[in-house]
Amino acid sequence: MQFQSVGNCAPCKDPCPLKSFCDPGLSNTCNIQPFVNPFGPRRAVATWKVNYLISNRNVLAAHCDPDLINPWGIVIYNNQLWVVCNNTDSITNYDLFGNKLLGTISIRNASHNPSYPTGIAINCGGGFSISTGNISRGGLMLTCSEHGTCHSFNPVVDPLHSFIVLNQQITGEVSVYRGLCIANNTLYLADFFQRHIDVFDQNFNRLIGYPFVDNDGSDPIPLNYGPSNIVNIGCFLYILWAKKDPNITLYAVDEPGAGYISVFNLDGSFVRRFTSRGVLNNPWGMIPAPAECGFPPGSFLVGNHGDGRINIFDCNGRYVGPVLAMTGLPLVIDGIRGLAPHYTDFSEIYFSAACDEMTDGLVGSLVKDQVIYF
């Protein structure tokens, strides 16, 4: 069976070297055959070993970093891990083995109060500039926060501090940004509280005319859901919806079947519903699954914060199965948030997790262990 793309993908303007790996419409140029074939008479499935690299507690991982509490977004840049820590208002930086590199990078608001940062995105293009003194550079990384702020960071400008570039509190609008992405020098922010996507250009001017309305009339997304994250994969934007806590609508609830994923064009026009409810449980992390690691070409990995599972979907949103642990049972990582594949050699998939009711933090990696047959 051939995997179909979700649409005709126009060439992207981003000079990002990862586009060839991120676009589900592109073929596996290395001609590596996947180990997982969910449509065959037998299933050969890869199992995965978990490497516990960093935690805020000595007993949980190989390395200890007290700043790693309630981590959310995680990215790999220049073969280094960059992790957003919600409870310590910081970005922490490690090599791929878990050794800490730069000092902790502060993400505080203007009055130095907590901002509770969440998502992080690498800026592959120009723009999103910050400056101090005589130094001005484009933002290397952008983060967002639950207090409705967006921060830009470049170590050349300041190696230990990010700069506030957007602050919705000033406008009087209550915004809770739980995720962000950058595409074609345009910034997209997922406002969980207001139930919409805020869009800005590279100079932080707000853009209008980006609807981001899920028009699936056969299965409308309930009003008590909000966009918990937005992910740029190829030439499409994927919005992950989570259910709001009825008591505190700033927060999402963990609940089986609580989640939707929608696909949009970069202009905010609706493409289709990717998947609804089912195995979703407060989803947040989503990445293209590397075929080189044994996943079906064009498939996706979606991490559930609610039950700690990572589920596999084909490019049409059909559920393939869970990622399996070494035991052959579904892999469970308590409080998993971000996912970051190592695009250089496809040997590992890194993750962040806010374990123990989000009072602890964990960063680790998944390494393919063996192949089992069903």
From Swiss-Prot:
Kindly list the GO CC terms recorded for this protein.
virion component
Q: Does the keyword DNA repair apply?
A: no
Subcellular location(s) per record: Virion
Q: Which InterPro entries match?
A: 6-blade_b-propeller_TolB-like (IPR011042), APMV_L690 (IPR017549)
Domain of life according to the entry: Viruses
- Keywords, alphabetical: Virion
Entry's family note: Belongs to the mimivirus R640 family.
**NCBIfam families xrefs:** PEPCTERM_chp_1
Q: Could you tell me what this protein is called? A: Uncharacterized protein L690
Q: Source species, please?
A: Acanthamoeba polyphaga mimivirus
